[in-house]
């Protein structure tokens, strides 16, 4: 694991791909909650932990790669959520603008 960047979970067109297969996850007994886009890094990390009797200093490269992937996933979800919130805010503003155009006098605008 040392000396190279982990494989990207993004395709050239921007879509996502799972690197670890369902069979690999089942073979390594990964819980469903850990079967995400970083599972391909968790499998060697867990193997290293088992083979070194969970010595914390022996699997640092694998742990760093896995935690980096998890952080990147967090940032990706955060960006997607902010884009979704912005789209909803713009949609709400358009609906409000259609209901209450600014060029109508105040008396004509429904307040309820």
UniProtKB/Swiss-Prot annotation:
Contains two C-X9-C motifs that are predicted to form a helix-coil-helix structure, permitting the formation of intramolecular disulfide bonds. Keywords: Disulfide bond, Electron transport, Membrane, Mitochondrion, Mitochondrion inner membrane, Respiratory chain, Transport. Disulfide bonds join 38-69, 48-59. Its main location: mitochondrion. Belongs to the complex I NDUFB7 subunit family. Residues 35-77 form the CHCH domain. It comes from the Eukaryota. This is NADH dehydrogenase [ubiquinone] 1 beta subcomplex subunit 7. A motif (Cx9C motif 2) lies at residues 59-69. It is found in: Mitochondrion inner membrane; Mitochondrion intermembrane space. The keyword Electron transport applies. It is a peripheral membrane protein. It comes from Dictyostelium discoideum (Social amoeba). GO terms for cellular component: mitochondrial inner membrane; mitochondrial intermembrane space; respiratory chain complex I. Accessory subunit of the mitochondrial membrane respiratory chain NADH dehydrogenase (Complex I), that is believed not to be involved in catalysis. Complex I functions in the transfer of electrons from NADH to the respiratory chain. The immediate electron acceptor for the enzyme is believed to be ubiquinone. The keyword Electron transport applies. Complex I is composed of 45 different subunits. InterPro entries: NDUB7. A motif (Cx9C motif 1) lies at residues 38-48.
């Amino acid at each position: 694991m040392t000396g190279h960047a982990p494989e990207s979970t993004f395709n050239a067109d921007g879509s996502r791909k799972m690197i670890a297969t369902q069979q690999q996850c089942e073979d390594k007994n990964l819980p469903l909650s850990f079967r995400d886009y970083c599972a391909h890094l968790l499998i060697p990390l867990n193997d290293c932990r088992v083979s070194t009797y969970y010595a914390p200093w022996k699997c640092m490269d694998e742990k760093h790669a896995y935690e980096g992937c998890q952080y990147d996933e967090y940032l990706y979800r955060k960006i997607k959520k902010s884009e979704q919130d912005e789209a909803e805010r713009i949609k709400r503003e358009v609906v409000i603008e259609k209901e209450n155009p600014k060029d109508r006098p105040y008396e004509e605008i429904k307040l309820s």
